[in-house]
Every structure is written in structure tokens, then in C-alpha cells.
Amino acid sequence: RGAAALQAIPHCVLLKGQGAKGAYISGLCTSPEHRRQNIGNSLMAQAHFHLYTLGTTFATLIPAEPWLHDWYGKCGYTKDIKCLPAPKGFATSSFEDYDRWQRSHDCILLNDADQFDIACKDYGLDPDHYLSQQEPVQGMIRIINAKKALELYASENTGMEMTVLVTGDRHIPANNCYYTIAHGNVTTSHEPRPDAQVMTIQQLSTFIFGSQQPVMCLMLN
């Protein structure tokens, strides 16, 4: 029997009309006899590094319990995303109608047609689960690839010129370096820059999204 497990479901993140690879992480669990052995953190680190090798830019999740917000925070996640209630009547609408709705948001974790179909079937099994959610639920998001995330930011802020030093990402050490933003482009370096603004991977997430909070919907948890 396995000691721990999780699943990372591929999604596309839409940010101001630009698409980026994303993943929704769910089902993280550790068998009772293997708890308090740092196995969960190790599994998350492996998952994050694997997602990085796949070219993923962001990972998202919804903590099952309030106390898990702090635990996921130590894994690099921030509370910079919310899960919206399901659109009224979504289960009887077409995917095309739902797709127009989801793409009306500036920053959202997109569902494809298959994922929408799964959510509709899940609704048929337990409609109360969807109808009971009236307010947005706090989710969490993590930057998997700092350079790709900053490239999205730079393309929307072509007048921005600055250097960022990302530090302390233990799950994805490749993110820890200097990033220079200029004229809509991003370059990396390991040469010290005294003018660099130092950020953790969590602070970088808040910097990139700012007041524009990403959203997601119809996530199975």
C-alpha cells in the first residue's frame, strides 16, 4: 500500500488573454502510519518539480481544512485565488455557453470540455454540493516556473524595468535566481545585482497578481 498520493490535473490558466500551463492539485493524502514523517511535503516537492519539467507555470488547489492553509503556505502557495460558485444552471447549459462565461474573466483556471462534462455528471450525483456554495471559497496558487510567470507579467507591463531576486524556493531550486524585466522581456542571471528586489516565491505570486485575483470554478476536491 502506498504511503501517500495526490493527483495533478492539467488546466490552462488564462491571464489577460494569454494562456499558460496550469495544474490543479487534489486528493493529497498520507496513510495514518506514515504521518508526521514529512512524506506529504516530500510528495509535494516531487510533484512541483515534475510540473516544472513539464513546462507548467502555475499550480492551484483548495485546502480541505482551514489549518492546511499554513501547511500549503510552507509549500510555496498563497491565498491569491478563489473558487467561484458554479454558474446558475451550468449543468443544463452547453460547454460553449460555459466557456464564454469563464473566458469573460481576466484571470481564470480554465476547464476544457471534458472537465466540464465531468463536473456536470458530478452535479447529477450530488447537486446539493454545488447548490450549497453561495460564496467564493478560498483557494491557493503557487508559481511553478518563475520565469514563465514573469514573462506573462512583463508582456502586460512593457514599461516596467526592474530586477527581482527570487530566493528560498526549496521545492524548485531553479527558480532561485535574478530576473531582469525590461521592454516586455525577462532575462535571468546568477550574477549579483545590488538593485534587485528580493522576493520569496510566495511574494512573487502576490506581486504578479496584485489586485487582480485569479479565480477557478467547478473544481472537484
Name every feature range the model reports, one short phrase each.
Residues 76-162:
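Amide-forming acyltransferase catalytic core, primarily the GNAT-like/NAT-type
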Residues 44, 51-64, 131:
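Conserved GNAT acetyl-CoA-binding A-motif
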Residues 27-30, 36-49, 74, 128:
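Conserved acetyl-CoA-binding loop-helix of GNAT-fold acetyltransferases
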